[in-house]
Design a protein with these regions (language model features):
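Active-site-proximal, substrate-binding regions of enzyme catalytic domains
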Residues: 2-107, 114-160
Length: 160
């Protein structure tokens, strides 16, 4: 076990939480990071939890972790005029996550929405948010814009 280890705080969107749980690494992530979410993510998780498939099962498990206070739910208070617009590729949940990052000065947003990535990066750069952490649901590789990982890459698989 690590001693004197301070967890890094991150904000995660709905699909990344579901992907991490479906991949079996959400609880490990919670051991390493303090995960916060805006209230809209809880609403989206409840919607997904209604499905009788792997995503629904994962959403129900994430909701249980929220009830156990292993994931913090935060109210988003400050929304600037620019951020209040929901872009075509960025949904309300992702925009709320970006707003929470800005409001609480949390430097890392965890998402797996590759379609929204260009707009998320643009918005984060406009608002001087330096880090977006992208979880690739198709593999265990992860890509970060402006962020060094806390662990070293595997010797035969350098980070891109």
């Amino acid at each position: 076990l690590l001693t004197n280890y301070s967890k890094t705080e991150v904000v995660a969107d709905t699909s990344s939480l579901i992907s991490l749980q479906t991949g079996g690494v959400l609880e490990l992530s919670l051991d390493l990071f303090d995960v916060s979410i805006p209230e809209i993510v809880v609403t989206e998780l409840k919607d997904v939890a209604g499905y009788d498939d792997a995503h629904g099962k994962s959403a129900r498990y994430v909701l249980r972790l929220i009830k156990e206070d292993k994931i913090s739910v935060r109210e988003v208070i400050s929304i600037s005029e620019t951020e209040s617009r929901v872009e075509s590729r960025v949904d309300a949940g992702e925009m709320s996550c970006l707003n929470l990052c800005r409001q609480e000065q949390i430097p890392i947003l965890v998402t797996d929405d590759w379609r929204a990535l260009p707009k998320l990066i643009e918005i984060s750069l406009i608002h001087k948010r330096r880090s977006l952490c992208i979880c690739d649901p198709r593999s265990t590789e992860q890509t970060c814009a402006g962020l060094r990982w806390h662990s070293q890459p595997e010797p035969d698989r350098p980070y891109r």
